[in-house]
């Protein structure tokens, strides 16, 4: 199958899904364009800030779409292009987009609260506590990992085996561009908030700033060491995760969303221009080097089809910015389908290389393979290969930073909500509760632990990220299914995704526990394996406990309707 045919199939399926299935869900759940959203009802100028659809879409899209939809399909391609493509399209439409839409809808109908609050309101306090504790720890792990990855991407120096220190121009350019994005985003935030111009002028200004940042970044690379970047990045996150969303988060993600969209559009043009052939087998085997297609393929592709992290963004930050309930469809459902399109492009990219060709060209990481393929495609229409390769790499590297403060903000909110129940009197709290629910305290303790994890080695437990991420998806689907049932809305479309993701996640965790247990008995105690085993067991117990509570509520015979 050629790249063009794969692209056309994806465009038809994803576009048709938005127009048909997305609107079907909108009608079934009863979207009310006249209802007052939490962005207005709870407006505080910090987290609850109403924003235009394109701005919130930019935040949602830039937060959920980073390296994930590129890395996942390329790694999963060992099973062949057909199962990867089928899961991206089927999973993206019926699993990921439904989860993201349902998470945002449930949040908007509950004052913009997170999935943790939804669990408390419709399942129980114990489930809420377990979920929020898991979310908080998950966010600490992600912040630690992403901060280290970003610092590594920005690192201006590399030392060879002989001890010679060399400047890395590409990293310096990415660093300059990313820092300029932040500076420009602050200015754009004030411009969007206080200007009276229409959205087209605002868009033009955003694109001009985007181009300016890229040009200056390529022209004036900045060289800073890895350790210094760690400090700078955590200082930035500290400010960004408590700053009003209109001042940085909204405009920065708005800028980056255009960069991401331009990359996708350029890639689509490249595919149609080059019409790359597919050099991958349609299907290889259910077992590739000891990796079983079920559940590995579904855990590995993750963001390109369904990711639990998306539910945290949908219910944690984006839901607090929705101006009108009708905007939820393009912001949540639409952003997920756009991410699935990016995943299909990544699959076409890796399939365009013959066996061993990418490695022969020095393309060893997934982003490099993606950038190299797109550069090859666009060179057909005369665009310089080296320039396109640099720009694609720059774009992919910049997106990790966009997710950082969103994750930190969600972590902060999870920590605060852990100590706040729905019946808590926030005006008459104890001194202890006032401290632990303070946004600055919650942010500092979250980031201090993430920084320490960065230094002591998050890599010991990072292999569990895929399973932990999909466990979040299970819990989000359970919470949303119970919410829809308790409020007398149709939620059967969540049941199959919920059961399937339970099977995927619990199987993956079970296989991991079995493998690690055998390793401990054969090789003895090992810090990495021991930590992974402990966390895997805890994740499995947590998932089973919350899932059992949720399933009980789904089958509970109670005709009393809860309002939302």
Regions from the language model: what does each represent?
Residues 2-19, 76-107, 116, 175-181, ...:
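Extracellular loop-to-transmembrane helix junctions
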Residues 14-38, 60, 90-116, 193, ...:
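Juxtamembrane transmembrane-helix boundary signature
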Residues 16-70, 257, 321:
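Membrane-interface "cap" regions at the ends of multi-pass membrane proteins
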Residues 51-110, 121-125, 142, 147-156, ...:
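Membrane-interface helix-loop-helix modules in multi-pass membrane proteins
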Residues 67-74, 91-99, 103, 107-111, ...:
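Membrane-helix boundary/coupling elements in multi-pass transport proteins
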Residues 125-140, 334-340, 388, 417-455:
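Loop-to-transmembrane helix boundary motifs in multi-pass membrane proteins
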Residues 189-194, 208-231, 239-241, 246, ...:
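Hydrophobic alpha-helical segments and their helix-loop junctions in multi-pass secondary transporters
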Residues 271-285, 337-373, 406:
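Extracellular/periplasmic helix-exit of transmembrane alpha-helices
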């Amino acid at each position: 199958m050629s790249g063009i045919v794969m692209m056309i199939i994806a465009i038809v399926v994803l576009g048709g899904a938005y127009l048909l299935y997305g609107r079907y869900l909108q009608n079934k759940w009863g979207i009310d364009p006249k209802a007052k959203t939490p962005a207005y009802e709870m407006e505080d100028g910090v987290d609850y800030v109403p924003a235009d659809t394109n701005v919130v879409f930019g935040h949602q899209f830039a937060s959920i779409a980073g390296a994930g939809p590129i890395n996942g399909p390329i790694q999963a391609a060992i099973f062949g292009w057909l199962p990867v493509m089928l899961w991206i399209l089927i999973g993206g439409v019926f699993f990921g987009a439904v989860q993201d839409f349902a998470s945002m809808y449930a949040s908007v109908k509950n004052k913009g609260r997170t999935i943790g609050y939804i669990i408390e309101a419709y399942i129980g306090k114990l489930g809420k506590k377990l979920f929020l504790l898991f979310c908080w720890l998950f966010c600490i792990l992600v912040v630690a990992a992403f901060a280290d990855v970003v610092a590594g991407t920005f690192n201006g120096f590399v030392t060879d085996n002989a001890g010679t220190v060399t400047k890395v121009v590409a990293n310096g350019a990415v660093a300059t561009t990313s820092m300029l994005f932040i500076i420009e985003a602050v200015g754009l935030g004030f411009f969007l908030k206080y200007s009276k111009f229409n959205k087209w002028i605002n868009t033009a200004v955003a694109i001009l700033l985007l181009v300016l940042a890229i040009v200056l970044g390529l022209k004036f690379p900045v060289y800073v060491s890895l350790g210094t970047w760690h400090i700078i990045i955590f200082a930035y996150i500290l400010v960004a995760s408590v700053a009003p969303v209109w001042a940085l988060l909204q405009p920065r993600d708005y800028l980056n969303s255009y960069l991401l969209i331009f990359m996708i559009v350029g890639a689509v043009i490249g595919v149609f221009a080059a019409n790359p052939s597919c050099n991958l087998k349609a299907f290889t085997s259910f077992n590739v080097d000891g990796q079983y297609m079920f559940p590995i393929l579904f855990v590995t592709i993750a963001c390109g089809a369904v990711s639990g992290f998306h539910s945290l963004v949908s219910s944690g930050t984006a839901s607090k910015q929705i101006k009108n309930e009708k905007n939820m469809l393009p912001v949540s459902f639409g952003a997920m389908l756009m991410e699935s399109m990016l995943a299909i492009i990544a699959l076409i990219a890796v399939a365009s290389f013959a066996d061993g060709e990418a490695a022969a060209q020095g393309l060893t990481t997934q982003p490099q393979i993606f950038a190299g393929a797109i550069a090859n495609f666009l060179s057909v229409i005369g665009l310089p290969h080296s320039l396109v390769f640099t720009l694609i790499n720059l774009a992919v590297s910049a997106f990790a930073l966009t997710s950082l403060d969103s994750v930190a903000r969600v972590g902060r909110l999870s920590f605060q909500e852990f100590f706040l129940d729905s019946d808590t009197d926030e005006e008459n709290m104890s001194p202890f509760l006032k401290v632990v629910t303070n946004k600055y305290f919650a942010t500092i303790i979250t980031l201090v632990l993430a920084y320490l994890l960065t230094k002591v080695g998050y890599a010991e437990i990072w292999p569990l990220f895929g399973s932990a991420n999909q466990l979040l998806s299970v819990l989000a689907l359970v919470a949303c299914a119970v919410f829809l049932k308790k409020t007398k809305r149709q939620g059967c479309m969540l049941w199959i995704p919920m059961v399937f993701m339970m099977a995927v996640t619990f199987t993956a965790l079970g296989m991991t526990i079995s493998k690690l247990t055998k390793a401990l008995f054969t090789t003895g105690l090992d810090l990495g394996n021991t930590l992974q085993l402990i966390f895997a067991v805890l994740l499995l117990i947590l998932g089973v406990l919350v899932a059992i509570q949720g399933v009980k509520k789904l089958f509970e015979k109670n005709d009393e309707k809860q309002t939302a």
